[in-house]
């Protein structure tokens, strides 16, 4: 294209001035008169008649050429029946009983039959044994523990015991899922083991949830094993859960998911805000513990930091747990936990069990956590008292947990060794995976490919590909995150697994 005549003249003028300026020595005196501004060249004309406008841009693509928009995994008749058995009155009775032990501080008495953590432990175990009696020998209740020596927040040697109810899977018993809460409590001074520490919300609510699910599941036969546990030592430093997680790790137990429930008892926050139909699920991202340096670097290079095992579990919980049958919305929070706080799911993550998440109420009221029971000068009642627990809300959170545990335990195992072909440049994406083997193979109907835009939080599309070990999708891997999940003969689906280059 020829430049307009005006532009040529202007450019020539600029060039002449620059040439003159170049002849002036660097140390020459500044001119005594103000320099004239250089004239700008005339604008070059552009024919934009064939260019699309922003309004016509097509990103992200409005639809996929293959597959279908993903849909929630709604409960079947059996799961609906189980959800209908969750009882707020039973949950309330458990919380009231635990509060009635006065304190459940880890360092409190273990010999008094009516007060302290020992009495609480014995009562929880006895209740769990009652549930086990209805399970036809498939549920075993144990109270494993160890003596913790003097350590952080432990001023003298003390026995730390967990109550563990294990419901053996009917078809794939070596695959294990854990539902947990902690039964110890505290007040303002974390070392004060004498004062009343009701711990109604933190965390009798979580223990009540785990116990209620143990009761409901005891009469049923999930395909995989589910463990319902009340752990101790959380407030002093996650001692009980660390002992449990390491015990499982040492025995090479295949824990495929941990649902930790801690502070799930209130729908009202410190400013009076109410959100009775939402529960937060905290899911850590990045590389899970034990991932090799090379694999972690690959994860970072492909944008896989948002597809950790914990976040895949979180997406699964949102898909199966947020619906009209639970009357809840699952709000995923992409971090390990809240600021300045911690929970027992971390013990499992640290032990190398990457699929561990935490359930917590949406709005917390710190007047009713870690507080001495008292009245403030303005009349505010302080303390973690049972009167501040919303039992209907706890029951709904229990339904989300029940839907998740049921769906996990009755689906086939999660797919392993998923790869995407990067051997050549292509706008198609070749995916491969290892077909489910062992006891879980009998549960499998086939496999499903899922995907989402790289900026999306949840899976957006799905494509059932059959009982195969590879599939080529007519989508570019550069623009989406893929996942592969197993589909059961009963319709239940596993959490997805993101592919690595292979």
UniProtKB/Swiss-Prot annotation:
Protein name, per record: Probable zinc metalloprotease MGG_02107
Region feature Disordered, mapped onto this chain: 284-307
Binding site for Zn(2+) 1: 182, 202, 262
EC number assigned by the record: 3.4.-.-
Co-factor requirement: Zn(2+)
UniProtKB keywords: Glycoprotein, Hydrolase, Metal-binding, Metalloprotease, Protease, Secreted, Signal, Zinc
Subcellular location field: Secreted
One Gene Ontology cellular component annotation held by this UniProt entry: extracellular region
Binding annotation for Zn(2+) 2: 202, 235
Glycan attachment sites: 250, 375, 417, 427
Domain Fibronectin type-III: 414-502
GO molecular function: metal ion binding; metalloexopeptidase activity
Signal peptide positions (record): 1-21
UniProt similarity note: Belongs to the peptidase M28 family. M28B subfamily.
Alphabetical list of InterPro entries matching this protein: FN3_dom, M28_fam, Peptidase_M28
A Pfam family reported for this protein in Swiss-Prot or TrEMBL: Peptidase_M28
Organism lineage: Eukaryota, Fungi, Dikarya, Ascomycota, Pezizomycotina
BP-aspect Gene Ontology terms: proteolysis
Top enzyme category: hydrolase
Cofactor note: Binds 2 Zn(2+) ions per subunit.
Broad class of where this protein is predominantly found: secreted
